């Protein structure tokens, strides 16, 4: 059984770094070059343990032997061999003990044969104690029952460096049921995928399952009035007028189909409108012409893969609210193209008619979800209880109360008591503490409300590590919300911390967890573990509410399918946290989403059909729109700069019209074009100007004298810096900010240190102040002279192949747009000038700036990639040099003057590999300097 499972589900090959995709890590377990051996044995099971011991002696490596209990018992003499004093490394034997042979439990015979017959003739049942067998042979034995136990046992056995038998307790019936669920899940997934493909016409004629393109994207800033402040605010934050702001995304497909999405960050999370707009402007540029595959609506990592491969950005770098709005707009566009609703689109063929019937029976309606009302407990117990009684009379079956905002938990408990006295138990009560209580206060509240039948208490404690402790001490049902919002990386591994039965629900806000794909992943984990998946919103407009209604219904279908797989009764209908619609005094459309009492159930519900109809007929109320953005048009022009007996025709590209001027300098082989997405993203905050540096792209050098003068002139860092200073003075009378990458970063650093009267600050991306000693510079000069000769002798393409094969570019080579980036490196008109610029501006030719750093007068921001070990260390040393003053106020000022940021998931070419964090950092740097 174990071997068959490994053959079926294990992966024993190394994943290609070239095709790496940023999907959830649980989908791609990685085994690095593990050598696997096996012996069939007589009758399939004899002598396996002895063979493993011989293999360990022969290969002189540590061996892990995984074996079933029956095979183990057929070779117990191997334990005697194991105990012999033979020169070899320790062996770890993992015995899967299900007390018999289980293979027949997976065959049809198990369903048609009496259990007594199976036990007697097929299962080879035994009651042998493996622990006692090991004790008899003086072999260490460990018994484990869970995955965590196994991990600990493996760690201990490896630390102790001794032979060990690890017995893993298993159960034939549980194993058979697990395999049944896997088979049914695989069948369901295949059916769903086939359904998606069949729903799209002429898909067989389309390459790579791509059937449409994004023609363009635009966005609008909206502002709508609220009746009351969002419950995330404190009572004393209330102003005269309350508004909610956000963006409407509009995606146009190549067949004129349109999809709408909403991006509405909330103030209590790590996003703001300015940061969000930077990302929207970047994506607006990057998404134009992007292909969309037909499998995106499956959500199972497809969006993440598309963002990485098509847009070239790690999905984790996109703000959650932006990703949510982007997915919403694309799904709505695809649904419109297909002529279906969003819920039908993402459901595909996942749900059987039986699942839908079970759900209809549970909701007493054809397709709808129940709504949980939200109550901000600002008032006396009597006042709050009266509000709840009115909600119950209106048809709400569930209310959520905000607690932990009063002096004492007993005051909140008094409100719950009064509600039960006034309304009774005909309504479900949820309470939400928003992590505001200490463990002691949460326990105090819990002990006061034990008899009031709370459906759950949401985020009762301020420290995550106290959640399980609270569950066990209070015996109250708990729900997670902010804890889910803060999960990073491998979400499923993080969720495993919360399998405790006391955690009964996960509250999922798609705009906070990062869209529908992540929300589905979290919801499915909850449903598989028998927990409620409650969809909630963050005071968004009816556009988001309509999408969440359809998504919540999809999750209910998913839950029905899971209950069928697990042979579990379908629980009563879940009321989803979409009651924030009552806060909307205005909406972004003339008519909001219809949420009302259903005639079928007398409960407040949202109809999936109404939600679909709202999106289908969505019309923007222009009175709510503050401004519209389509796309920034770049200006392209040439400026001639003279210097002595030569001049340079600088090609410039420009975006934005603000008073702040930011000059962008590329690295060797780059051009001004590579800064286009960054400049467009920052065009609301700065006038961005990118430059083709001398010898690069379309910036030729012109000589006013003979060839001998040309040979004598060096395009050194100092010379280029002088040229750029003259260029900047021609462009603007004001000070500027420099942003430079690699070679451009060295030039920017030189100018920031030397021309502080004109340079207000500089962002140094993967830059260096040069080499400290002459010996190192001499070696580097020789290396770069050889490389320049290679460029002149064998041409640019050969040089590119050699240049980008180095270790410095390993991370860039893994980027899905690497080939596109390399093609952009061929756009240079004068190879001779390019080779001259390369050698003359070599770090071996440059004067060291290490000694000048401590005299720096302007703010500097150093940005490096997480995988760029060399430049991470250089940036750290530069910060130390700048701040190496003797205490006092000078030290404090130097610390503020120098910042360092390490960008995750990238190497040397930070701005190309992971651009969004770079854009955000540069934007904040611009804002910071504007305040000085």
Question: How should each PLM-predicted stretch be described?
Answer:
Residues 190-205, 209, 241, 538-630:
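Flexible C-terminal active-site loop/helix
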Residues 753, 758-792:
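Flexible "cap/lid" loop of the alpha/beta hydrolase fold
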Residues 774-778, 790-852:
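Conserved alpha/beta-hydrolase catalytic His-Asp/Glu region
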Residues 209, 252-338:
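Metal- or metallocofactor-binding catalytic centers and their adjacent structured scaffolds
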Residues 401-547, 584-593:
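Catalytic core of soluble alpha/beta enzymes
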Residues 642-653, 673, 677-680, 684-739, ...:
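Active-site loop/oxyanion-hole signature of alpha/beta-hydrolase fold enzymes
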Residues 9-12, 16, 23-194:
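Thiamine diphosphate
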Residues 855-906:
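Conserved loop-alpha-helix segment in the C-terminal half of the alpha/beta-hydrolase fold
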């Amino acid at each position: 059984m174990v071997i068959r499972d490994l053959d079926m589900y294990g992966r024993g090959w190394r994943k290609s770094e070239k095709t790496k995709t940023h999907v959830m890590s649980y989908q791609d377990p990685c085994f690095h070059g593990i050598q696997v051996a096996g012996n069939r044995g007589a009758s399939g099971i004899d002598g396996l343990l002895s063979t493993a011991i011989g293999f360990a002696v022969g290969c002189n490596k540590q061996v892990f032997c995984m074996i079933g209990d029956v095979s183990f018992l057929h070779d117990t003499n191997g334990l005697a061999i194991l105990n012999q004093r033979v020169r070899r490394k320790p062996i770890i034997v993992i015995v899967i003990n299900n007390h018999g042979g289980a293979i027949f439990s997976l065959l049809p015979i198990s369903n048609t044969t009496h259990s007594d017959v199976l036990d007697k003739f097929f299962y080879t049942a035994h009651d042998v104690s493996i622990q006692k067998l090991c004790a008899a042979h003086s072999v260490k034995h460990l018994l484990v029952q869970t995955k965590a136990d196994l991990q600990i046992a493996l760690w201990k056995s490896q630390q102790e460096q001794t032979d060990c038998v690890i017995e893993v307790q298993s159960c034939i019936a549980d194993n058979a049921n697990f395999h049944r669920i896997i088979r049914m899940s695989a069948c369901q997934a295949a059916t769903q995928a086939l359904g998606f493909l069949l729903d799209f016409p002429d898909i067989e004629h389309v390459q790579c399952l791509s059937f449409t393109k994004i023609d363009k994207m635009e966005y609008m800033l909206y502002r709508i009035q609220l009746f009351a402040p969002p419950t995330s605010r404190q009572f004393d934050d209330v102003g005269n007028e309350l508004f909610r702001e956000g963006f409407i995304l509009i995606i146009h497909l190549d067949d004129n189909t349109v999809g709408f999405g909403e991006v509405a960050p909330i103030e209590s999370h790590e996003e703001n409108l300015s940061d969000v707009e930077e990302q929207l402007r970047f994506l607006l540029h990057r998404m134009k012409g992007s292909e969309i595959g037909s499998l995106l609506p499956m959500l199972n990592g497809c969006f993440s893969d598309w963002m990485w491969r098509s847009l070239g950005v790690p999905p984790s770098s996109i703000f959650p609210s932006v990703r949510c709005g982007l997915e919403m707009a694309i799904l709505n566009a695809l649904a419109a193209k297909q002529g279906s609703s969003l819920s039908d689109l993402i459901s595909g063929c996942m749900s059987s008619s039986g699942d839908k019937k079970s759900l209809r029976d549970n909701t007493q309606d054809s397709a709808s979800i129940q709504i949980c009302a939200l109550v901000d407990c600002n008032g006396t117990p009597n006042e709050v209880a009266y509000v709840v009684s009115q909600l119950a009379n209106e048809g709400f079956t569930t209310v959520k109360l905000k607690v932990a905002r009063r002096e004492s938990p007993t005051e909140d408990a008094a409100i719950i008591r009064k509600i039960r006295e006034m309304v009774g138990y005909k309504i479900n009560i949820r309470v939400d503490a928003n992590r505001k209580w200490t463990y002691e206060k949460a326990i105090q509240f819990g002990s006061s409300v034990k008899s009031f039948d709370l459906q759950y208490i949401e985020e009762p404690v301020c420290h995550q590590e106290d959640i399980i402790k609270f569950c066990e001490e209070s015996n109250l049902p708990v729900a997670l919300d902010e804890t889910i919002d803060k999960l990073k990386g491998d979400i499923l591994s993080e969720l495993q911390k919360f399998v405790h039965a006391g955690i009964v629900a996960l509250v999922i806000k798609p705009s906070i967890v990062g869209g529908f794909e992540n929300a589905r992943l979290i919801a499915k984990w909850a449903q598989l573990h028998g927990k409620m998946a409650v969809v909630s919103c963050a005071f968004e407009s009816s556009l988001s509410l309509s999408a969440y209604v359809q998504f919540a219904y999809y999750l209910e279908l998913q839950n029905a399918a899971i209950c069928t797989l697990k042979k579990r009764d379908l629980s009563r209908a879940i009321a989803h946290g979409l009651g924030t619609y009552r806060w909307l005094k205005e909406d972004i459309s003339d008519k909001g989403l219809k949420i009302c009492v259903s005639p079928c159930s007398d409960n407040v519900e949202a109809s999936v059909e109404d939600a679909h109809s709202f999106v289908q007929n969505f019309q923007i109320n222009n009175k709510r729109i503050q401004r519209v953005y389509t796309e920034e048009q770049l200006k392209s022009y040439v400026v001639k700069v003279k210097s002595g007996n030569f001049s340079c025709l600088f090609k410039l590209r420009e975006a934005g019209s603000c008073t702040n001027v930011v000059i962008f300098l590329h690295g060797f082989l780059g051009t001004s074009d590579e800064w286009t997405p960054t400049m467009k993203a920052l065009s609301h905050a700065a006038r961005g100007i990118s430059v083709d540096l001398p010898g690069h792209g379309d910036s030729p050098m012109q000589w006013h004298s003979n060839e001998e003068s040309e040979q004598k002139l060096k395009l050194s860092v100092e010379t280029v810096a002088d040229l750029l200073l003259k260029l900047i003075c021609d462009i603007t009378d004001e000070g500027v900010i420099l942003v430079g990458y690699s070679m451009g970063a060295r030039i920017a650093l030189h100018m920031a240190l030397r021309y502080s009267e004109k340079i207000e600050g500089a962002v140094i991306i993967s830059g260096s102040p040069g080499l400290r000693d002459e010996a190192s510079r001499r070696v580097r000069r020789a290396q770069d002279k050889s490389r320049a000769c290679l460029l002149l002798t064998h041409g640019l393409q050969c040089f590119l192949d050699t240049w980008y094969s180095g270790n410095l570019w390993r991370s860039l080579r893994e980027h899905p747009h690497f080939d596109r980036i390399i093609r952009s490196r061929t756009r240079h008109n004068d190879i001779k000038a390019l080779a001259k610029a390369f050698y003359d501006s070599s770090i071996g030719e440059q004067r060291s700036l290490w000694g000048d750093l401590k005299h720096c007068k302007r703010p500097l921001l150093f940005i490096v990639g997480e995988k760029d070990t060399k430049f991470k260390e250089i940036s750290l040393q530069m910060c130390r040099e700048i701040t190496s003053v003797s205490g006092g106020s000078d030290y404090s000022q130097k610390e503020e003057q120098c910042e360092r940021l390490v960008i995750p998931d990238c190497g040397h070419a930070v701005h190309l590999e992971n651009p969004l964090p770079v854009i955000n950092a540069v934007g904040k740097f611009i804002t910071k300097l504007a305040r000085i």
